């Protein structure tokens, strides 16, 4: 039975890069992994495949939206480490619903019966707006993971995600595994001071601290995971947190919780206390 993860976070903070590197770390530890990009930008799997692959929506358009005419090969591409990759895609700008597209991708995967062949399935989901469609992966997930940076906007989005997880947990099995601190900069960004305080208040923990490092940015633009970059101390520093997260997720009983969201004023107090 697959371990299903829903990875959320505010747009533009490195969520997809982090997810791809977690997928790579899991695969290198022997897991059979599927990563599903659930963002209209359809670039979630780029570090794994080195290409902007065809989306589910593009594939459906080619067969006039007849699901039964699609095969796995039409929508799944195998990338680094044997990780299978899929991109849901999105509707044309100004029309349709991106969340609906996520739901259609999930429906197609169910019809193809691919779930049971994987050890781990990761949904990489846009987390700025957790509407019904974009929250759909929480219906299937064992755990949610939030990617966040040490700033107000990211923490505000993380709190909204905690609200969605809390609400979904009343009907589904999903729990919050924890928060991954991304782009951690102890010189300019305060490290993880605000994230640590926020995590304590909502009843979760920081799973790992991914450093703010130029090498991670370079790997992203090169269409590679950090594990494919040249060996050296900098690479070791960057891949360490991804391996820590993979080890945690592959443990038999990873700790988790139903988060307790805080009020907006509480977030302002956290941020204001560190200015």
Swiss-Prot record:
Protein family: Belongs to the NifH/BchL/ChlL family.
Nucleotide-binding found in the keyword field: yes
A single BP term in Gene Ontology: light-independent bacteriochlorophyll biosynthetic process
The UniProt record lists the keyword Calcium: no
UniProt: ATP binding residues: 12-17, 41, 182-183
A Pfam family that the UniProt record links to this protein: Fer4_NifH
Descriptive protein name: Light-independent protochlorophyllide reductase iron-sulfur ATP-binding protein
Keyword entries, A-Z: 4Fe-4S, ATP-binding, Bacteriochlorophyll biosynthesis, Chlorophyll biosynthesis, Iron, Iron-sulfur, Magnesium, Metal-binding, Nucleotide-binding, Oxidoreductase, Photosynthesis
Cofactor binding mode and count: Binds 1 [4Fe-4S] cluster per dimer.
Catalysed reactions, as listed in the record: chlorophyllide a + oxidized 2[4Fe-4S]-[ferredoxin] + 2 ADP + 2 phosphate = protochlorophyllide a + reduced 2[4Fe-4S]-[ferredoxin] + 2 ATP + 2 H2O
Pathway assigned to this chain's UniProt record: Porphyrin-containing compound metabolism; bacteriochlorophyll biosynthesis (light-independent)
């Amino acid at each position: 039975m697959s371990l299903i993860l829903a990875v959320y976070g505010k747009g533009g903070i490195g969520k997809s890069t982090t997810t791809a590197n977690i997928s790579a770390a899991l695969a290198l530890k022997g897991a059979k992994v599927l990563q599903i990009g659930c963002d209209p930008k359809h670039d979630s799997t780029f570090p794994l495949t080195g290409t902007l692959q065809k989306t589910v929506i593009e594939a459906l358009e080619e067969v006039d939206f007849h699901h039964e005419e699609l095969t796995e090969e039409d929508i799944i591409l195998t990338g680094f480490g044997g990780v299978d990759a899929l991109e849901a895609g999105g509707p044309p700008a100004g029309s349709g619903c991106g969340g609906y597209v996520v739901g259609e991708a999930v429906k197609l995967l169910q019809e193809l019966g691919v779930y049971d062949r994987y050890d781990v399935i990761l949904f990489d989901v846009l987390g700025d707006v957790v509407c019904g469609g974009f929250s759909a992966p929480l219906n299937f997930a064992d755990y949610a993971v939030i990617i966040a940076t040490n700033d107000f906007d990211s923490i505000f989005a993380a709190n909204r995600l905690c609200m969605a997880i809390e609400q979904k947990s009343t009907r589904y099995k999903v729990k919050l595994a924890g928060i991954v601190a991304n782009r951690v900069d102890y010189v300019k960004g305060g490290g993880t001071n605000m994230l640590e305080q926020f995590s304590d208040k909502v009843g979760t923990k920081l799973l790992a601290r991914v450093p703010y490092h130029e090498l991670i940015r370079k790997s992203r633009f090169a269409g590679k995971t950090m594990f494919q970059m040249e060996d050296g101390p900098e690479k070791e520093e960057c891949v360490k947190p991804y391996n820590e997260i993979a080890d945690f997720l592959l443990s038999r009983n990873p700790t988790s919780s139903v988060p307790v969201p805080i009020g907006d004023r509480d977030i302002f107090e956290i941020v204001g206390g560190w200015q």
